């Protein structure tokens, strides 16, 4: 609801909008409620799963974020170069375009409250909460209202090793037909982190729509 006024604040003309992962999930909800604000949606491996996975999840108790693996992420760095050096050879970051990883480490950190170091701009507990609640609100409740032309880009799917395994796609393979996507493409050589691994290819896709 907080984002509903956002498209109008950008000038009022229909937008070509792109979202990745949970960003694409949120974009579908926004576009379903503000269709006139959008000319085209580019949904890159959205965290929109098989409808059956959402059944009964809204009634499931929410575990405390510290019990989630995402809450245990390291959250103290100094300087950003330390973070980049640590991630360069670690999955999934090793497959990212080096420029993207450098930007992530530079702009994904903020000064700590005591000014003695840097911490993640997205607090680990908040990230954990997002994953914990991902199945509690089914996007299939609003997808049938989605009328904006769309392009869907997916990574290969399969049996994932858990909710934080993004070597494979979390996207429901039936999503393209369900929303009437004009293009439904499998980028088989990439993981869930398509924009980070192939920024130039994604940029070219967007440029063709502008």
Residue ranges and their predicted role:
Residues 51-118, 122, 126-137:
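Helix-rich cap/lid subdomain of alpha/beta-hydrolase
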Residues 1-4, 84, 199-207:
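Short, amphipathic alpha-helical "lid/cap" segments that border enzyme active or binding sites
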Residues 12-57:
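Conserved hydrolase catalytic core segment
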Residues 99, 109-178, 183-186:
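Conserved serine/cysteine hydrolase catalytic core
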Residues 1-15:
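Conserved acidic catalytic loop of the alpha/beta-hydrolase fold
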Residues 6, 30, 34, 205-209:
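Hydrophobic residues on the short alpha-helix immediately C-terminal to a glycine-rich phosphate/catalytic loop
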Residues 187-199, 203:
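Catalytic histidine-centered segment of alpha/beta-hydrolase-like enzymes
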Residues 49, 160, 193:
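Active-site loop signature of alpha/beta-hydrolase-fold enzymes
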């Amino acid at each position: 609801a907080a984002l509903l006024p956002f498209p109008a604040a950008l000038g009022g003309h229909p937008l070509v909008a792109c979202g990745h992962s949970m960003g694409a999930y949120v974009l579908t909800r926004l576009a379903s409620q503000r269709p006139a604000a959008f000319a085209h949606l580019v949904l890159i491996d959205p965290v929109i799963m098989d409808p059956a996975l959402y059944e009964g999840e809204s009634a499931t108790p929410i575990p405390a974020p510290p019990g989630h693996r995402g809450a245990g992420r390291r959250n103290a760095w100094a300087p950003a170069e330390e973070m980049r050096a640590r991630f360069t050879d670690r999955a999934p970051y090793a497959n990212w375009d080096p420029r993207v990883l450098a930007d992530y480490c530079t702009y994904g950190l903020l000064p700590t409250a005591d000014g003695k170091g840097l911490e993640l701009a997205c607090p680990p507990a908040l990230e954990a909460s997002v994953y914990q609640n991902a199945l509690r609100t089914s996007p299939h409740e609003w997808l049938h209202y989605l009328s904006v032309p769309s392009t869907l880009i997916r990574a290969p799917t399969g049996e994932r090793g858990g909710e934080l395994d993004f070597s494979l796609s979390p996207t429901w393979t039936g999503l393209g037909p369900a929303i009437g996507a004009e293009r439904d493409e499998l980028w088989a050589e990439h993981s869930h982190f398509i924009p980070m691994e192939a920024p130039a290819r994604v940029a070219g896709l967007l440029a063709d729509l502008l």
